[in-house]
């Protein structure tokens, strides 16, 4: 149970700051649990990611990020969906703030779609104070 709670915390990139609805939290929790199981990440890896530790280059962690971002519609086949990101985060954080972070992060490209997702997650995490 603690593992699922940890996942729900890391999944929406500062969910508390964004004040997600109960429904949004439930969806994030379910998607996170599914992706964690699918990719086989450990509790320690989830905690590290939640705490902003992006030193883990384990492909499982990177593919977890990809799985989650695809489930919520932010990525499709490694490509950022800027309209979806703005539609989902804009009402929570303000469109101008989200657009500013998008300008910094959305051109991120990694070696493959999992690496791209991980780098994108890291960029959004590091710029979360702006959204």
Curated annotation (Swiss-Prot):
<feature type="disulfide bond">
    <location>
        <begin position="35"/>
        <end position="67"/>
    </location>
</feature>
<feature type="disulfide bond">
    <location>
        <begin position="105"/>
        <end position="123"/>
    </location>
</feature>
<dbReference type="GO" id="GO:0007606">
    <property type="term" value="P:sensory perception of chemical stimulus"/>
</dbReference>
<comment type="similarity">
    <text>Belongs to the PBP/GOBP family.</text>
</comment>
<keyword id="KW-0813">Transport</keyword>
<dbReference type="GO" id="GO:0005576">
    <property type="term" value="C:extracellular region"/>
</dbReference>
<feature type="signal peptide">
    <location>
        <begin position="1"/>
        <end position="15"/>
    </location>
</feature>
<dbReference type="GO" id="GO:0005615">
    <property type="term" value="C:extracellular space"/>
</dbReference>
<dbReference type="InterPro" id="IPR036728">
    <property type="entry name" value="PBP_GOBP_sf"/>
</dbReference>
<dbReference type="GO" id="GO:0007608">
    <property type="term" value="P:sensory perception of smell"/>
</dbReference>
<dbReference type="GO" id="GO:0019236">
    <property type="term" value="P:response to pheromone"/>
</dbReference>
<dbReference type="Pfam" id="PF01395">
    <property type="entry name" value="PBP_GOBP"/>
</dbReference>
<dbReference type="GO" id="GO:0042048">
    <property type="term" value="P:olfactory behavior"/>
</dbReference>
<protein>
    <recommendedName>
        <fullName>General odorant-binding protein 56d</fullName>
    </recommendedName>
</protein>
<keyword id="KW-0732">Signal</keyword>
<dbReference type="GO" id="GO:0005549">
    <property type="term" value="F:odorant binding"/>
</dbReference>
<feature type="disulfide bond">
    <location>
        <begin position="63"/>
        <end position="114"/>
    </location>
</feature>
<comment type="function">
    <text>Present in the aqueous fluid surrounding olfactory sensory dendrites and are thought to aid in the capture and transport of hydrophobic odorants into and through this fluid.</text>
</comment>
<keyword id="KW-0716">Sensory transduction</keyword>
<dbReference type="InterPro" id="IPR006170">
    <property type="entry name" value="PBP/GOBP"/>
</dbReference>
<keyword id="KW-0552">Olfaction</keyword>
<keyword id="KW-0964">Secreted</keyword>
<keyword id="KW-1015">Disulfide bond</keyword>
